Design a protein with these regions (language model features):
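Solenoidal tandem-repeat scaffolds enriched in leucines and small polar residues
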Residues: 78-173
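Loop/turn segments within WD40 beta-propeller blades
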Residues: 1-5, 45-52, 92-99, 139-158, ...
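Conserved strand-to-loop turn within each blade of WD40 beta-propeller repeats
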Residues: 11-14, 57-61, 104-108, 116, ...
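WD40-repeat beta-propellers
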Residues: 17-22, 44, 64-69, 91, ...
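WD40/WD-repeat beta-propeller blade-loop signature
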Residues: 4, 30, 40, 51-54, ...
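WD40/WD-repeat beta-propeller blade N-cap
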Residues: 34-41, 81-88, 128-135, 141-142, ...
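C-terminal interaction modules of eukaryotic adaptor/scaffold proteins
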Residues: 226-284
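Beta-strand initiation motifs
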Residues: 25-30, 71-77, 119-124, 178-184, ...
Length: 284
């Protein structure tokens, strides 16, 4: 879904991307088909509209393609990245405060971060062997520093990433002087099978940082860090008794959507006592 909720981009195993217009009154209409990948497309992601009408896609073919809309509903391949040697499983645009910046996680174990320059080129930084058996998901931390709302003075935007992979772990990374370094010791490990999805919650400037992770083992874990520099603590939200494919936060960070292997999407909320409770099941 784009920023304005007007268009949906879909990724398919037939190697195509479709742009669909969504209208409250007349339903949906097909606007464009984007062809460029040579294998299943795993994920698509819209950039913030301040950068124009831009879409990123990643595929089993190892490529990441940046698509740009020229004339209305005419999409061009603005850039193709061939940095990865195997399937690129996850892409995530950074908070817009950090510029036009895309993180990519691959089955080759590496994470690459591409940042657009003013001259139209791209700078690349890498996290080599972030998860040696394969990276399954990446998610950016909010740009607003934890505690910025309750602190004083101006703080620089935060450049942090969460990742997960086939080594059953979640890891947190921070950019120090142009180099990505692990920011959690040890790696966050409460799952006993592949971690399929990781999502960093919006924190609205509050001191606590929160990450959700979903695993093949059927559990979703909520990781919290009370304040910068402290250890992350994990709590199992629920055991779904079936692989969990995806977790996603609401814009305010107080609702978590969970998609599981039984084709259910459930919404969860933290109660006053710190326990997580199911709020509803999302009906298709």
């Amino acid at each position: 879904m784009d920023y304005y909720g007007k268009r949906v981009a879909t990724a398919s195993s037939d190697a195509t991307i479709k742009i669909i217009g969504v209208n409250n009154n007349s339903g949906s209409q097909h606007l464009a088909s984007l062809k460029g990948h040579k294998g299943p497309v795993w994920q698509v992601s819209w950039a913030h509209p301040k950068f124009g009408s831009i879409l990123a896609s990643c595929s089993y073919d190892g490529q990441v393609i940046i698509w740009k809309e020229g004339n209305q509903n005419e999409w061009l391949q603005a850039h193709i990245f061939n940095d990865h040697k195997s399937s690129v499983n996850s892409i995530a645009w950074a908070p817009h405060e950090l510029g036009l910046c895309l993180a990519c996680g691959s089955s080759d174990g590496n994470i690459s971060v591409f940042t657009a320059r003013a001259d139209g080129g791209w700078d690349t930084t890498r996290i080599d062997q972030a998860h040696p058996v394969g990276v399954t998901s990446v998610s950016w931390a909010p740009a607003m520093a934890p505690g910025a709302l309750v602190g004083s003075g101006l703080l620089d935007p935060v450049q942090k990433l969460a990742s997960c992979g086939c080594d059953n772990t979640v890891k947190v990374w921070k950019l120090y002087n142009g180099t990505w370094k692990m920011d959690c010791f040890p790696a966050l490990q409460m799952h006993n099978d592949w971690v399929r999805s990781v999502a960093w919650a919006p924190n609205l400037g509050l001191p606590k940082s929160t990450i959700a992770s979903a695993s093949q083992d059927g559990t979703v874990v909520i990781w919290t860090c009370a304040k910068e520099g402290e250890q992350w603590e994990g709590k199992v939200l629920n055991d779904f008794k079936t692989p969990v494919w995806s977790v996603s936060w609401s814009l305010t960070g107080n609702l978590l959507a969970v998609a599981d292997g039984n084709n259910n999407v459930t919404l969860w909320k933290e109660a006053v006592d710190g326990q997580w409770q199911q709020v509803t099941v999302v009906e298709p």
